Amino acid sequence: MAKLTKKQKEAQSKIENGKTYTVAEASALIKEVSNANFDASVDLAVRLNVDPRKANQMVRGVVTLPHGTGKDVKVLALVTPDKEEEAKEAGADYVGLDEYLDKIKGGWTDVDVIITMPSVMGKLGPLGRVLGPRGLMPNPKTGTVTMDIAKAVSDVKAGKIDFKVDKHGIVHAGVGKASFDAEKIAGNARELLTTLVKLKPQAAKGVYIKTIYMSSTMSPSVQIDTKRFTEQ
């Protein structure tokens, strides 16, 4: 195991072993222990008591973080010519269709989100092997396949994120940056956790949220009390 640096030891010493924190406490603590020399992302890892191999226990959804992600989200709008102006005015970084489909075929994926229209989805099918593994395939369930292109682009730019439980039953999602006020990190985290509770599958038995950890890039993680995460 790699030896901890002095900074890492200092950070670790601020977190009490075996203690669980409220969201507000964890958010303040993460700001204290985040020692990266860049504006680190703050992430939540939520372990759910579900079996994602079963279709009736899959958890996926979208949430608009009230304080945004802190990230400049690059959006590609794959639209027909009549929708191009709408996409540009809403703030899409790249707008077009066939030229971008060709670029993606060639391996280009330098975007965070792709938004498209139902009539274009047929053209995206063959690109699934490029887009799927990167989480870029548009999906009606996450609002990225729609006729209201302007709203979809605006929502993503304002802090709308989508999430999905992984094969281990964990949802990973960013809830801001270390430069955010602790209150903003906490507000975003609560919004995500509340959304996860609403999405509890009927087939999920027993305790739904098993553990919640908050961390920032290169920082130790802080455990959040699963019974107190709605506290202000």
UniProtKB/Swiss-Prot annotation:
Q: Which residues form a coiled coil?
A: none
Gene3D superfamilies for this protein: 3.30.190.20, 3.40.50.790
Q: InterPro entries this protein is in?
A: Ribosom_uL1_bac-type (IPR005878), Ribosomal_uL1 (IPR002143), Ribosomal_uL1-like (IPR023674), Ribosomal_uL1/biogenesis (IPR028364), Ribosomal_uL1_3-a/b-sand (IPR016095), Ribosomal_uL1_CS (IPR023673)
Alphabetical GO CC annotations of the entry are: large ribosomal subunit
Protein keywords: Repressor, Ribonucleoprotein, Ribosomal protein, RNA-binding, rRNA-binding, Translation regulation, tRNA-binding
Give GO terms: molecular function aspect only: rRNA binding; structural constituent of ribosome; tRNA binding
Q: Name one GO biological process term.
A: regulation of translation
Pfam family membership, one: Ribosomal_L1
Q: Which family does it belong to?
A: Belongs to the universal ribosomal protein uL1 family.
NCBIfam families, per database record: rplA_bact
* Annotated function: Binds directly to 23S rRNA. The L1 stalk is quite mobile in the ribosome, and is involved in E site tRNA release. Protein L1 is also a translational repressor protein, it controls the translation of the L11 operon by binding to its mRNA.
This chain belongs to the protein called: Large ribosomal subunit protein uL1
Organism equals: Christiangramia forsetii (strain DSM 17595 / CGMCC 1.15422 / KT0803)
